[in-house]
Structures are given as C-alpha cells and as structure tokens.
C-alpha cells in the first residue's frame, strides 16, 4: 500500500488517482473516511472524498 505525498490518499498505484501526485511506501497511521460531509476529522484534514488516508507520509 502506498500513500500520496500531497493528499495522503492510500492506493496501490505509484501515482495518486485523486490528485495525480507521486506516492510513497513510507507512511504511518490510518484514517478511514466513510462520510466526509459529516466527519469533523475529515473536515479538519481537508478530506472531501471517502477512502483510506495516511496520517503522515514521507518520501
């Protein structure tokens, strides 16, 4: 599993399908967003698409 360096979206791809930025295998923490419209944590993190996200990503 890889995390986007920009939006932190988790994917298996080397390029993020959401923002088209590079991804990294060096990430920690997991945030699963089911309903971004109602999630206070998603709003604070700037997430508006449901999915799995890393809490921290390094190159």
UniProtKB/Swiss-Prot annotation:
Which domain of life does the UniProt lineage start with? Archaea
Query: Does this entry carry the keyword Transcription regulation?
Result: yes
Q: Which GO terms describe its biological process?
A: regulation of DNA-templated transcription
Q: Which UniProt keywords apply?
A: Metal-binding, Transcription, Transcription regulation, Zinc
List the molecular function annotations (GO) for this entry: zinc ion binding
Transcription: present as a keyword of the record?
Answer: yes
Annotated Zn(2+) binding sites: 4, 7, 16, 19
One Pfam match, given by its short name, reads Spt4
InterPro entries attached here? Answer: RPABC4/Spt4 (IPR029040), Spt4/RpoE2_Znf (IPR022800), Spt4_arch (IPR007178), Spt4_dom_sf (IPR038589)
Q: What is the similarity comment for this entry?
A: Belongs to the archaeal Spt4 family.
Described purpose of this protein according to its UniProt entry: Stimulates transcription elongation.
Q: How does it assemble?
A: Heterodimer composed of Spt4 and Spt5.
Name listed for the protein in its UniProt record: Transcription elongation factor Spt4
* Taxonomic source organism: Methanocaldococcus jannaschii (strain ATCC 43067 / DSM 2661 / JAL-1 / JCM 10045 / NBRC 100440)
């Amino acid at each position: 599993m890889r995390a986007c360096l920009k939006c932190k979206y988790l994917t298996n791809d080397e390029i993020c399908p959401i923002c088209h930025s590079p991804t990294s295998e060096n990430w920690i923490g997991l945030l699963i967003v089911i309903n971004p419209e109602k999630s206070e944590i998603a709003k604070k993190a700037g997430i508006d698409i449901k999915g799995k996200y890393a809490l921290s990503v390094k190159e």
